[in-house]
Amino acid sequence: MTDHEAKWDKLLQINTVGRDDKNADEYSYPYEPTPYCVLERLEESGLIRRDDVVLDYGCGKGRVDFFLSRQCGAKTIGIEYDQRIYRSALENQQTGRSRAEFVLARAESYDVPTDVNRCYFFNPFSVEILHKVMARILESYYANPREIFLLFYYPSEEYISYLMTVDELEFYDEIECDDLFTGDPRERILIFSLPQNLFVGDGALDVPFENVLNLSKAE
């Protein structure tokens, strides 16, 4: 653990350091927190504000949630499937004062609240699960059309290839982080958007989840 990591954990009154792969498999990847220096860069981008609701997929012990809640003032929701790690997030919630809340659920089964407008991913699961998660996000979007930003830290080629096939998504920007870590081109946050004006007309669009899932699958 670096001094910088320790400093932030102490400031936020949480314990999130270390890697945990005890329950990892080919579909659900190990717990590894986003480095604080990357979160600082995300904060500096201005993409997360007080009136935003951030959904953190594979939140682990809650580092992203506590940081963005404290530094940006946003409401954050962390989704975690591993009950043991989820309990660690709840323990952090007792000491870290923030607007963060945590849900024990599988990402592909979680109904995305219709006020969520930011989604954060740090390679939490396989691209097969991402297909289903994207369908859930689109279902929420159709129920309440709004601008949503999807942020992918350290994205894999498989993730990028799939995301480029989702018709509803637009590439928005990227936050470069390769200067923070030597020689790794994956050190960046790719940002995709669901624009508010994707559809003509007002009001909710009644699209069943099964239909959305078909729309979001890669060709």
Describe the residue ranges of each PLM region.
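S-adenosyl-L-methionine
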Residues: 1-49
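Conserved class I S-adenosyl-L-methionine
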Residues: 51-58
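Conserved SAM-binding motif I beta-strand of class I
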Residues: 75-80
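Conserved SAM-binding strand-loop segment of SAM-dependent methyltransferases
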Residues: 97-106
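C-terminal substrate-binding/active-site "lid" region of AdoMet-derived donor-dependent transferases
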Residues: 128-190
